[in-house]
Every structure is written in C-alpha cells, then in structure tokens.
C-alpha cells in the first residue's frame, strides 16, 4: 500500500515537471528560435551521419551552413523587439545580447568554409567536427543571453568543452595533444575561479542567482560595499581574464594557437572572445554596478599589460600562428577600453564595431594561413618569403588583412581603432589611449616585417617551400578562397561605410 502511494506521488511529480517544462517550451520557445534552429541542425547532422555514406559529405556542410544562416535570419527578423525575460528568469532577449549572438553566428558561418579542404587533407572526422562547432556556437549564444549564474556557467562550459575537444582534434599530432592538455587544465582552473567568485555573489546577495536580483539582494543585505564584493570581483575578473586571454592570464594562448588545427584556431580566436565579452559587459555592469571604480582600475591594468606584452612579444615570434596569438592578446587590450568606457560615451558601440572589423581581419588572415599551409605544409614566418612571386592574390590578401590589423588607413582596422580610442579619450582615459596608440605602432612594425617578406623577390631569401609552391586547382579550394575574399573585402571597405554599423551598435545598447 505504501509503495502504491509513493508510486502515485512519483507519477504526479513527474507529470507536473513535464507539464511545467512543456509550458516553458511552448510559451518561451519562440524567444530562443535561433538557438532551436541550431539544435535542429545538430539532430539532422547526427541522423545523416548514421544513415548515409561518404558520398553525402557535402550535405553535412550544407546543413551546418544553412542552419547558421537561418539562425542569423531569425535574429535579424527579431531585431528591435521589446526586451524579454523568459524561462523563469534564466534567459534574457534584447538587442544588445542579439548583437553578440549575431557576431558568434557570423564567425561560425565564415569558419565552416575554411575547414572543408583542411579536414579532407588531414582526414579528420567531419561529422564530429561540425557537431562540435555548432554546439560551441549554441553554447556561446546561450551565454550571450544567460541571465543567472547557473545558466552562465552551463553555457560557458558547453562552449569550453567543445573548444577543448576541437583543439585536440588531430589526436595523432603531439603538439595538438599538448595544446589540448594545457587548454583543458587552464580552462578548468579559470572556470573554477570564476565559479568561486559567483559563490561569493550568491552568498552576499542572500541566495540570489539572477543578475538583477543579485543587485537587489546586495542592497537589501547592505553588502554592496563590503570587502566580500571586492573578493568576488577579483576572482570573477581573473576567470574572465583567462577566457579573454588577457595578460597575465594569457599563458595558454600561444601554445593552443600553435598546436591546434588552423581552422579551429580561427574559430576560437574570434568566437571565444565575443562570447567572453558578452559575459564581461553584463557581469561588470549589473552585479558590480556599485564597484565600478574598482573594476575599472582592474581592467585598466589588465588592458595595459595586454597591449604592451602582447605586441612586444609578438615581434620575436617565428611561427605565424604564435605571432597571431600574441597579436590577439594586444587586440583584446584595445577592446577592453570600450568596456571601461561603457555605454555613457559610446564605449560599448565602439567595442561592438571594432569586434566586427576584428572578425573580418582575423578570419581573413587565418584563411590565408590555411591556404598557404595546405600548399606548403609550413607555418614558419620565414617561409612566406617571396610568396608574391608565386601567388600574388594570396600575398596581397594576407598583406591587406595584416595592414588592417595594424590599423593603417584607409582600411577597416584604422577606423575601428580610431573610434575606440576616440571614445576612450572622450571618457578621460588618456593614459590608456596613449598606450594603445604606441603599441599599435609597434604592431605595425611586425606586420610590415611580414609583408616585406611576402613581397621580396631576392632568390637567396626565398625558401624551398615557396620555390616549390604550386597553386591547387581553384575548384578544390573555392570554399576557403570564398571566405578569404569576403573577409578581405570587409577588412578593406567596412571602415569607409562604418556610420550605419555605429548607428546599429548604438541602437542596441540597453
């Protein structure tokens, strides 16, 4: 009899849980429609992989790309809708979050064509690669809209775990295994530090997990100026610093960039930063609203260290991917200026604008590196000498992307940095902007050094890799070259027509 009653209670509880989940999905599911498209794409990929043979491989790429494009379209149709909080306060939909989701989807859409030829040449498992990319994208999108500490952590780990698996995808490569181990250990440590900071917020706010409720809880408990908030701020800043590759938490970045497959590095170099920036803007702006002076100071120190160390160490590198790793550390130092300025002086708008330009510049550079690596098998900067004599199109494309990264006019990188530094100057961050200008000059030096190598025609400087360089048939590399052309064009002309981009970014601010 007792067993019968317990069984009935279990059935009733299960039914209630199911009905509540069904109610949430029915009424709140439309608010995560772009994410649902990606989930449907993931299911389709699994079904095709289980029921098809090698002849259906193009369908896998088609489904992945189509689901990403459809998700972008769904986001665009939802633009300028009223902000909504759904799933019992766990997820927030507004224009500011959707801008970051759009950037993550754009990165993934451009990265898949970069991977096609590389995967075929290295004989990597295609389905699993695409699954990890889409799942990481999904985690990044949920991270952009997460509105409570638990959802933030789950979405962050969804993205991070896929990143670890992607970095070690070429498991027969010793460097890839080493990169994965370092990435996993450092990433796990940073997540632990971040969660420890979250636990302080949870305790000080009286047991609240929603971001806005944490602020209310801190006011009610009179803990918003307590030493505990400073402890939480330090731990959360360190955790986010690892995710953003800010100095001095950047140690994992060069090894992961060098050891991971190049398309994976291209993907991680932009999506991880966009997702972490989406998290940083909300974490610092909402729960730490009363500690703005403290986190401004912390971020200023990290930005200065990143700009100086990243650009100075990049000069000494001999590997193209390691050079871009240190360059990315310097670049994120510039972006931090936008976070410090905030939405009062267009800081967030300048950050979003520069990240859009950075995506095109960085992915264009990596597209060139993928092509060169497939045709020569090397990543050494010295081996790029004389490339212009063999492949002028690739050499010019790489030169334009590097010049844009350096911030030379009239390319997009120049206008992006100009807007970012101008916002910083207007906000009174004079020292930070001066450091940014000086380190930008340093970065131009090592970018020009590579471009000089590309354009050299002296035989004694040309290595056997370029001397024996052979262009592959266009048909085999058209997807990589398509991504490269799109990124090069964007890196060249986006800055000239940046006013509409700035207007959209300003319109998204909460």
Curated annotation (Swiss-Prot):
Which sequence ranges are marked TM in the entry? 31-51, 57-77, 99-119, 124-144, 149-169, 184-204, 229-249, 261-281, 295-315, 323-343, 354-374, 395-415, 418-438, 484-504
Catalyses: a plastoquinone + NADH + (n+1) H(+)(in) = a plastoquinol + NAD(+) + n H(+)(out); a plastoquinone + NADPH + (n+1) H(+)(in) = a plastoquinol + NADP(+) + n H(+)(out)
Q: Which domain of life is it from?
A: Eukaryota
Chloroplast among the record's keywords?
yes
Q: What class of enzyme is it?
A: translocase
Q: Which GO terms describe its molecular function?
A: NADH dehydrogenase (ubiquinone) activity; quinone binding
One Pfam family from the record: Ndh2_N
| Biological-process GO terms, alphabetical | ATP synthesis coupled electron transport; photosynthesis, light reaction
Q: Name one GO cellular component term.
A: chloroplast thylakoid membrane
Keyword set includes Cell cycle = no
How does it associate, per the subunit comment?
Answer: NDH is composed of at least 16 different subunits, 5 of which are encoded in the nucleus.
Identify this protein by name: NAD(P)H-quinone oxidoreductase subunit 2 A, chloroplastic
What is the scientific name of the source organism? Nicotiana tabacum
